[in-house]
UniProtKB/Swiss-Prot annotation:
Gene3D superfamilies attached to this UniProt entry: 3.30.300.20, Ribosomal protein S3, C-terminal domain
Organism encoding this protein: Edwardsiella ictaluri (strain 93-146)
Taxonomic classification: Bacteria, Pseudomonadati, Pseudomonadota, Gammaproteobacteria, Enterobacterales
Family classification: Belongs to the universal ribosomal protein uS3 family.
Keywords attached to this entry: Ribonucleoprotein, Ribosomal protein, RNA-binding, rRNA-binding
GO cellular component: cytosolic small ribosomal subunit
InterPro entries: KH_dom, KH_dom-like_a/b, KH_dom_type_2, KH_sf_prok-type, Ribosomal_S3_C_sf, Ribosomal_uS3_bac-typ, Ribosomal_uS3_C, Ribosomal_uS3_CS
Annotated function: Binds the lower part of the 30S subunit head. Binds mRNA in the 70S ribosome, positioning it for translation.
Classification via SUPFAM superfamilies: Prokaryotic type KH domain (KH-domain type II) (SSF54814), Ribosomal protein S3 C-terminal domain (SSF54821)
Record's protein name: Small ribosomal subunit protein uS3
Subunit (UniProt): Part of the 30S ribosomal subunit. Forms a tight complex with proteins S10 and S14.
Annotated ranges, domain KH type-2: 39-107
Length: 233
């Protein structure tokens, strides 16, 4: 049976950046990775209703810098910056180093796979029909300029006894084209019948040239080898 590679993982370093951008030696790596996980867990719990798309973590010179990409920056910042200060203290306590928090606004939440998946799950939890939720997400994405979108839901759809999978696609979603800018994410809806999984793929176009490459010193051109002609015996 054919299996699909993770659309984001296969594109890392080609057209997709990493969510954690830091280097560490062997002794510190595991601790940094663990604190990254705990920081993300803490922020996702605190900002559950703030439409957080992704959290990028950097570690410059014994400190931690967290960039929160959100569709609702006002909820994250809070009144006079009180909420963001509380988050900064929480992150600094978990990481054990001074923390800095930056907020980046997501201009078009309808073209962000994580926010689209979360929107569908919240509708499913409010007992909206799954087909209507899927169609609405697809129409909004295509209206705002997506080249293609695919939405898949799986579980006890509509309270059915037997779990099944249904999907809806519009436009093209080329998973094998590495230069294709495909945003992929998942979410879970916890309903009275059980958990319903939601997957979203959004194709935004092709990125020609890829990510900015690190310039390397040019090697001297190799001299072409002279071919010796064998004389006739």
């Amino acid at each position: 049976m054919g299996q699909k590679v993770h659309p984001n993982g296969i594109r890392l370093g080609i057209v997709k950046p990493w969510n954690s951008t830091w280097y560490a030696n062997t002794k510190e790596f595991a601790d940094n990775l663990d604190s990254d996980f705990k920081v993300r867990q803490f922020l996702n719990k605190e900002l559950e209703k703030a439409s957080v798309s992704r959290i990028v973590i950097e570690r410059p010179a014994k400190s931690i810098r967290v960039t929160i990409h959100t569709a609702r920056p006002g909820i994250v910042i809070g009144k006079k910056g009180e909420d963001v200060e509380k988050l900064r203290k929480g992150v600094a306590e978990i990481a054990g180093v001074p923390a800095q928090i930056n907020i980046a606004e997501v201009r078009k939440p309808e073209l962000d796979a994580k926010l689209v998946a979360d929107s569908i799950t919240s509708q499913l939890e409010r007992r909206v029909m799954f087909r209507r939720a899927m169609k609405r997400a697809v129409q909004n994405a295509m209206r705002l300029g997506a080249k293609g979108i695919k939405v898949e839901v799986s579980g006890r759809l509509g309270g059915a006894e037997i779990a099944r999978t249904e999907w809806y696609r519009e436009g093209r979603v080329p998973l094998h084209t590495l230069r294709a800018d495909i945003d992929y994410n998942t979410s879970e809806a916890h309903t009275t019948y059980g958990v319903i999984g939601v997957k979203v793929w959004i194709f935004k176009g092709e990125i020609l040239g890829g990510m900015a490459a690190v310039e390397q010193p040019e090697k001297p051109a190799a001299q072409p080898k002279k071919q010796q002609r064998k004389g006739r015996k």
